[in-house]
Design a protein with these regions (language model features):
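A ligand-binding cleft/hinge motif common to bilobed small-molecule-binding domains
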Residues: 125-131, 248, 253-271
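Mature extracytoplasmic/periplasmic domains
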Residues: 282, 286, 290-350
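Bacterial lipoprotein signal-peptidase II cleavage site
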Residues: 19-33
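Periplasmic-binding protein-like
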Residues: 148, 161-165, 225-230, 269-294, ...
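Sec-dependent bacterial lipoprotein signal peptides
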Residues: 1-20
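Short, polar/charged alpha-helical segment
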Residues: 49-63, 69-90
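Extracytoplasmic ligand-binding site segments that recognize negatively charged/polar headgroups
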Residues: 65-80, 92-108, 114-251
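Extracellular/periplasmic bilobal clamshell ligand-binding domains
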Residues: 332-374
Length: 374
């Protein structure tokens, strides 16, 4: 799902690509390692005989398939390259700009092949709707992660988070202080939402932010849908999926997205600013999970260990995201204190939708979003 330190401190506020052309090659069905461990059923590094044996098993597989991880999203470029350099395992990154639902679709379409994704990084609504596709696994740092941010068996674990924000090129549009500003004529043809809210976690939270700013709540996302319908009628809403290139080219001068992506945009566009609207502070975490049918099950588990290690968590922090183990690492003295202290404070009461609220909102979006903005 950002308040100066990790979103873990907000826990009390919450209850909580289709295959085309020739068929992909089939993967080997035997996931047993040289030491006799069934990697696909391993639920911890202990099942391999410890981390050293897990590393060996993953290196024997030699590859890891990831999906929907843009290089400039939460520092994934460095995370991937560091994993490759550390373990000498090739990371195959497919569809980097795909949405969460695309990850699930790819896993279903490519099931049984060596091209299927090994791991997922999903928005809340898509993750909770597909838990039967995940393999339970507890990383060595599992106990550091608050109960509110993980499945008890490790079927899914929240990994990093942030706040929904409005990023904008201050050389093109006036300063933004609220969601309502986006309806002004100065924003005509300039406002983009990162993704389709029925498929992408960022877009879902963007509509939730608009709902709260317009009298709705985590229980009532309808005002958010109405806001975007009005934004479209006013000619302000761009039906363009924004990314780093559209921001740099000026195609999408205003983007509703996670605040850590705004920080990444500012690194390339000097005039880019990011604001978290005080009247609609929406926080959210992404969900990390292993594909139960992963073609490289040992590498998938090593990837999880890396992401939730001190090094992996600090790499997300370097990208402006708030790592789920942040508070525990700060207490242990393993957090990057300079980066941790530099996280911007956010004013306002944060809203973290519960699982039930997310499901209800997702159902409403599925029934109403497309007809509202057509």
């Amino acid at each position: 799902m950002k308040v100066r330190n990790a979103l873990v401190s907000l826990a009390a506020m919450a209850t909580l690509a289709a295959a085309a052309g020739c068929a992909a090659p089939e993967k080997e069905s035997d996931t047993t390692t040289e030491s006799g461990v069934d990697a696909a059923s391993a639920t911890s590094s202990e099942d391999f005989g410890g981390m050293d044996e897990l590393v060996k098993a993953a290196q024997d597989e030699g590859e890891l398939n990831v999906i929907a991880l843009p290089p400039d999203w939460a520092n994934y470029a460095e995370i991937i390259s560091t994993f490759e350099d550390t373990y000498d395992i090739k990371v195959n990154s497919d569809q980097p700009d795909a949405a969460s639902q695309d990850e699930i679709n790819a896993a279903n379409d490519l099931k049984g092949t060596d091209r299927a994704p090994d791991v997922f990084d999903l928005g809340q609504s898509v993750a909770l709707a597909n838990t039967d596709m995940f393999a339970p696994y507890k990383v060595e740092t599992f106990d550091d992660i608050p109960d509110e941010y993980k499945d008890p068996d490790g079927t899914w674990v929240n990994d990093y988070g942030g706040y929904m924000s409005i990023g904008y090129d201050s050389s093109v549009v006036p300063d933004v202080t609220s969601v309502a500003d986006l309806m002004k004529p100065e924003f005509k043809g300039k406002v983009a939402l990162n993704g389709d809210p029925t498929q992408a976690g960022a877009a879902f939270s963007g509509v939730m932010m608009a709902a709260i700013a317009n009298g709705g709540s985590a229980d009532d996302i309808a005002p958010g849908v109405d806001f975007f319908a009005d934004l479209k009628k006013a000619g302000n809403f761009l039906t363009v999926d924004p990314d780093s290139s559209t921001i740099e080219q000026g195609t999408t001068p205003v983007v509703i997205d996670w605040d850590y992506l705004g920080a990444a945009a500012a690194a390339n566009v000097d005039t880019w600013k990011t604001v978290v609207p005080e009247e609609a502070v929406v926080a959210g975490y992404y969900f990390q999970a292993i594909n139960a049918d992963a073609p490289h099950p040992a590498a998938a588990r090593l990837w999880q260990e890396f992401l939730f290690s001190d090094e992996g968590q600090n790499l997300w922090l370097k990208g402006g995201a708030r790592p789920v183990r942040g508070d525990a690492m700060a207490e242990a003295g393993t957090i990057d204190e300079e980066l941790w202290g530099a996280l911007p404070e956010v004013t306002g009461e944060p809203v973290i939708p519960t699982d039930e609220q997310t499901t209800k909102a997702g159902e409403y979006l599925a029934a109403n979003w497309s007809k509202a903005i057509r």
